[in-house]
Regions:
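C-terminal catalytic subdomain
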Residues: 95-203, 210-217, 223
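Alpha-helix boundary/interfacial micro-motifs
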Residues: 35, 42, 213, 222-223
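Short amphipathic alpha-helical segments and their helix-coil junctions
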Residues: 18-23, 88, 196-207
């Protein structure tokens, strides 16, 4: 059990039941604890490569000038003519689903201060783009968008060619489900470009521990 070493209901339960206790450092806030035993122990149990995770995080910290985590804050401040009230994070990989949930906490606890702040929204591509894109495109222009994309080309199961033979959509022949995902994310980003939306794309060539460590570290420094 991981908890602070102080008299608390959780600490008492652990002691009374002779549980293995690991101390959680009281000076590390919840949103930053992902790199402490709170986040690392579950990661080890899940079989993740922790060395690669920390290596990726260190890469960003030691090369901040290359990754430029301060650019978003600078941009939002300089756009005085636009009142951004929402920060939309759209991830195009199921592997980043829980990263998105953590990002909401990170952003809210870091940015929401003194009756000020920008609300973070996590959208999952392509699922949420079908339910939310209408609002994003034709609604109020008060949102900044971050697309986190990866390479889906030629991945996943191949579409049944016979199904589309002789139809108006026979261009699906010889394509994979990954090809469809790739087309979806590229088309959405191109639409945002054509409409002059404020957005950025963070491209991750492979969703692995090394790149996840980079993404986590980058996000913490950014906020």
């Amino acid at each position: 059990m991981i908890t602070e070493f102080k008299e608390s209901p959780l600490y008492k339960i652990a002691k009374d039941n002779n549980c293995l206790l690991l101390e959680h450092h009281k000076d590390v806030g919840g949103r930053y604890s992902i790199f402490t035993n709170v986040g690392i122990v579950p990661a080890i149990i899940s079989g993740l490569n922790i060395d690669a995770l920390f290596s990726g995080a260190s890469e960003v910290i030691n090369n901040i000038g290359n990754y430029k985590p301060y650019d978003l804050g600078r941009y939002l401040i300089q756009k005085e003519n636009v009142k951004f009230t929402n920060n939309v994070l759209m991830t195009y990989s199921d592997s980043l689903y829980f990263f998105g949930k953590w990002y909401l906490q990170l952003w809210a606890e870091s940015i929401g201060k003194n009756n000020k702040g920008i609300t973070a929204i996590h959208s999952v591509g392509t699922t949420d783009q079908h339910s939310q894109l209408q609002l994003y495109l034709d609604g109020p222009k008060d949102k900044y968008f971050t697309f986190i994309t990866t390479d889906h080309s030629n991945k996943g199961i191949k579409i049944n060619n016979d199904m589309f033979e002789g139809t108006a959509i026979d261009y699906f022949k010889d394509k994979t489900m990954g090809d469809l995902m790739e087309a979806e994310q590229r088309a959405t980003i191109e639409t945002f470009k054509l409409n002059n939306f404020s957005f950025r794309e963070i491209y991750i060539p492979k969703i692995d521990e090394q790149n996840l460590g980079k993404l986590l570290s980058f996000s913490i420094i950014e906020t």
